[in-house]
Amino acid sequence: ATYKVKLITPDGPVVFDCPDNEYILDAAEEQGHDLPYSCRAGSCSSCAGKVTAGTVDQSDGNFLDDDQVADGFVLTCVAYPQSDVTIETHKEEELTA
C-alpha cells in the first residue's frame, strides 16, 4: 500500500506519497524534501519528528524509549507509514529537552 505523508516543517507543509515498505525519510529525500538526519539507523535523535495523525511502524529503531513513542515521537529514518500520516519534523530539541 502507498500512503499520503504530510510533513509539517519549519518552511511549511509538504505532502508526498510513501509506500508502506519505504522509510519516510528516504521517500521524502527522493522527492526533493530536505530533512535533518545523522545516523540513518534509528540510533540517534537527529531526524526526530512527532506524529500528530496516523500511525507508523518504527520497530527498526532502538533510540526512543516507550514513553517517547507513546508521546508520538518518531525517527523518520526508520519509520514506515501504516496509514496516511502527519508528522511535525525538526523535533530533536523537544525530544531531548
Swiss-Prot record:
This is Ferredoxin. Keywords: 2Fe-2S, Chloroplast, Electron transport, Iron, Iron-sulfur, Metal-binding, Plastid, Transport. Residues 3-93 form the 2Fe-2S ferredoxin-type domain. Binds 1 [2Fe-2S] cluster. One of its GO terms (biological process) is ferredoxin metabolic process. The lineage of its organism: Eukaryota, Viridiplantae, Streptophyta, Embryophyta, Tracheophyta. It is found in: Plastid, Chloroplast. GO terms for molecular function: 2 iron, 2 sulfur cluster binding; electron transfer activity; ferrous iron binding. Its cofactor is [2Fe-2S] cluster. The keyword DNA damage does not apply. Belongs to the 2Fe2S plant-type ferredoxin family. It comes from Alkekengi officinarum var. franchetii. Ferredoxins are iron-sulfur proteins that transfer electrons in a wide variety of metabolic reactions. The keyword Plastid applies. GO terms for cellular component: chloroplast; chloroplast stroma. [2Fe-2S] cluster binds at C39, C44, C47, C77. PANTHER family: FERREDOXIN, FERREDOXIN-2, CHLOROPLASTIC.
